[in-house]
Amino acid sequence: MRINHLINGQPVAASDYFETVNPATQEVLAEVASGTAQDVNAAVAAAKAAFPAWAGRPATERARIMRNLGELIARHVPEIARTETQDTGQSISQTGKQLVPRAADNFHYFAEMCTRVDGHTYPTPTHLNYTLFHPVGVCALISPWNVP
């Protein structure tokens, strides 16, 4: 199996791939795209292009979409847990009862944060100060992929 990047909703081939190996059996599970700075820049450009439409959606709709992602993960815990166990060597009880369900829970938590982050007013004798939260932009994060 070959796993490509997913940029702008489309699979994108990489210039290089690495093998992911089941640590228990040494079986090659897949060839995974190895990202470059150019790949990150393409993903950031796609995200920037999509950002105005995302930011323009009501917070309740953004929350619904994120909740749906959490539900999708939750419906597939057994399959995702098996894959994670094969990929990382962690026990199936850890991936199936903790790590993968936690990934679903994270989407549910941040979905709720979309609708619960309220601004505050801080009156002073001469001015009205307030906070206002809204989407501000795109960022890229490259981190170890050792848990879902």
Regions found by a protein language model. Give the residues of each.
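Glycine-centered flexibility sites
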Residues: 9, 35, 89, 119, ...
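Residue-level signature of catalytic and energy-coupling elements of molecular machines
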Residues: 9, 26, 62, 107, ...
